């Protein structure tokens, strides 16, 4: 697959040959979905907690005698049916993470990249660098490229000036190539790869 390379100013800067094994697959939504669920489950803190009947601070003394009152038989006041009692089957601190084989995660990333390429949402930049770290300048460049919602992937290191200028622009994310992931690819309309990112991805998936 051949794709033209553009500059930040919107000018053509040649073309690049993309591997069909990475960008030319027929996207499988089931594999992509499994990876997204895995990512979102893993990022949950799992710190929610409610006290059960053994943990609430309240007397455990029997409320009243067993017989002779005409009332229902009750023991501890910590039981869930009373106000101030413990919660029945409440949330506890736990990990929400699920297992997903590494091969499936790698395959899902390939399918996500292929989905962007097939849908026309993939752009290749020659480089993501700015002479002066000015957000206003970068907004103008993005407007010319039609980038309202985009994930920008650079090489192993992101240019500090570019990252600083893009930081306050809504719906724009900038990541190094080692941070690329399925969820962030899908949540933005466009995927922008620099030539360095393309080379790194093809070396990674060899």
UniProtKB/Swiss-Prot annotation:
Cross-referenced Pfam families: Ribosomal_L4 (PF00573)
Cleavable signal peptide: none
GO biological process, one term: translation
Keyword Ribosomal protein in annotation: yes
Keywords: Ribonucleoprotein, Ribosomal protein, RNA-binding, rRNA-binding
GO molecular function: rRNA binding; structural constituent of ribosome
A cellular-component GO term for this protein: ribonucleoprotein complex
Gene3D superfamilies xrefs: 3.40.1370.10
SUPFAM superfamilies linked to this entry: Ribosomal protein L4 (SSF52166)
Keyword RNA-binding among record annotations: yes
InterPro entries the UniProt entry points to: Ribosomal_uL4 (IPR002136), Ribosomal_uL4-like (IPR013005), Ribosomal_uL4_dom_sf (IPR023574)
Role this protein plays: One of the primary rRNA binding proteins, this protein initially binds near the 5'-end of the 23S rRNA. It is important during the early stages of 50S assembly. It makes multiple contacts with different domains of the 23S rRNA in the assembled 50S subunit and ribosome. Forms part of the polypeptide exit tunnel.
Family recorded in the similarity comment: Belongs to the universal ribosomal protein uL4 family.
Annotated PANTHER family: 50S RIBOSOMAL PROTEIN L4, LARGE RIBOSOMAL SUBUNIT PROTEIN UL4M
Cited HAMAP family: Ribosomal_uL4_B (MF_01328_B)
Record note on quaternary structure: Part of the 50S ribosomal subunit.
The protein, known as: Large ribosomal subunit protein uL4
Species the sequence originates in: Rhodopseudomonas palustris (strain TIE-1)
